[in-house]
Amino acid sequence: VTXPDGVNTATNA
């Protein structure tokens, strides 16, 4: 998911 840095960090981990 593309989004501002830090927003989706947990989702993309």
Curated annotation (Swiss-Prot):
GO MF annotations, alphabetized: diarylpropane peroxidase activity; metal ion binding
The keyword Iron appears for this protein: yes
Catalyzed reaction equations: 1-(3,4-dimethoxyphenyl)-2-(2-methoxyphenoxy)propane-1,3-diol + H2O2 = 3,4-dimethoxybenzaldehyde + guaiacol + glycolaldehyde + H2O; 2 (3,4-dimethoxyphenyl)methanol + H2O2 = 2 (3,4-dimethoxyphenyl)methanol radical + 2 H2O
EC number in record: 1.11.1.14
Any single GO BP term: hydrogen peroxide catabolic process
Coiled coil (residue ranges): none
Pathway(s) it belongs to: Secondary metabolite metabolism; lignin degradation
Superkingdom, natural source: Eukaryota
Disulfide-linked positions: none
UniProt keyword list: Heme, Hydrogen peroxide, Iron, Lignin degradation, Metal-binding, Oxidoreductase, Peroxidase
Function according to Swiss-Prot or TrEMBL: Depolymerization of lignin. Catalyzes the C(alpha)-C(beta) cleavage of the propyl side chains of lignin.
Family: Belongs to the peroxidase family. Ligninase subfamily.
Name of the protein: Ligninase B
Taxonomic placement: Eukaryota, Fungi, Dikarya, Basidiomycota, Agaricomycotina
